[in-house]
Amino acid sequence: MTQCDARLPQGGVKLADYTTWRVGGAAEWLAEPASLDETQAWIEWAAHQGMPCRVIGAGSNLLIHDDGLPGLSLCLRKLQGLQLDATTGTVEVLAGEPIPSLARRAARAGLHGLEWSIGIPGTAGGAAVMNAGAQGGCTAEWLESVRVVPLEGGNCFELQRHQLDFAYRHSRLQEDNLVVLSARFRLQPGHDPDELKRVTTANLSHRTTTQPYQQPSCGSVFRNPEPLKAGRLIEEQGLKGTRIGGAEISTVHANFIVNTGDAQAKDIAQLIHLVQDRIEAKHGIRLHTEVKRLGFASAA
């Protein structure tokens, strides 16, 4: 018997309130664990009930269908906490810790490595799954290991960096049915905290002035077809400002789709397809998304 048997998760919760895009239908069930034990208990509960379990993390990089999601949706935004060692550069962080918080804490301790991540709207766990990156940096450079548990339940175990098959905006965690519980980073100690603060402040300023920071979005929608830039390709097609329903290709940065106030997930999905079709017709390149779709026929 688990600690979840005496109670039920929340039913019929609108997932739009749990995503950075502010779209999505209701979850059949929603749980917000605040500890590792509670997270594992909810996963075991879903397995015992024979229902699907999906991790929505803190709701960034996700597009959830307007019809919502069956089974248990696991929101990890309350699973926060970190411990750092300013001497060795080791940082142990729970999966729901916001990336900007992690970057600031590391900088204050004189630990170099995560200054690039200051404006990323996600969590440590999500960064590991997506190999999040910005401004020339990426998670794979600094991540040492992750602690995971199978979505179908079972014992947690550790995966080292070399086991994660990191590539551009990719890790094996995107294919495996594993939930990231915590992560360990190995940063460079001994740096001047004031200088690191200056760099993080400059990086954040750059993001807020070149991206639609004040509007609901998922961050970058498309992966760059290296060495080309997705945003540049989209802008060259004159697609900035293109709107379907309440969803709009940002006039600030073309690789962002923003919710202007009343968007639905279907509007965003249609805009994504419009961009993909237009770029493929012009350049023969099919842009792939960074965002993960839940409840749709296709997850990418």
Swiss-Prot record:
Cofactor: FAD
Subcellular locations according to the entry: Cytoplasm
GO cellular component: cytosol
Main localisation: cytoplasm
Swiss-Prot/TrEMBL catalytic activity: UDP-N-acetyl-alpha-D-muramate + NADP(+) = UDP-N-acetyl-3-O-(1-carboxyvinyl)-alpha-D-glucosamine + NADPH + H(+)
Gene Ontology terms: biological process: cell division; cell wall organization; peptidoglycan biosynthetic process; regulation of cell shape
EC code(s) of this entry: 1.3.1.98
Biological pathway: Cell wall biogenesis; peptidoglycan biosynthesis
InterPro entries for this protein: FAD-bd_PCMH, FAD-bd_PCMH-like_sf, FAD-bd_PCMH_sub1, FAD-bd_PCMH_sub2, MurB, MurB_C, MurB_C_sf, Oxid_FAD_bind_N
Keywords, ordered alphabetically: Cell cycle, Cell division, Cell shape, Cell wall biogenesis/degradation, Cytoplasm, FAD, Flavoprotein, NADP, Oxidoreductase, Peptidoglycan synthesis
Broadest EC class assigned to this enzyme: oxidoreductase
One Pfam family it belongs to: FAD_binding_4
Active-site residues per Swiss-Prot or TrEMBL entry: R169, S220, E290
Domain of life: Bacteria
Protein family membership: Belongs to the MurB family.
HAMAP family linked to this entry: MurB
Function: Cell wall formation.
Record's protein name: UDP-N-acetylenolpyruvoylglucosamine reductase
Source organism per UniProt: Synechococcus sp. (strain CC9605)
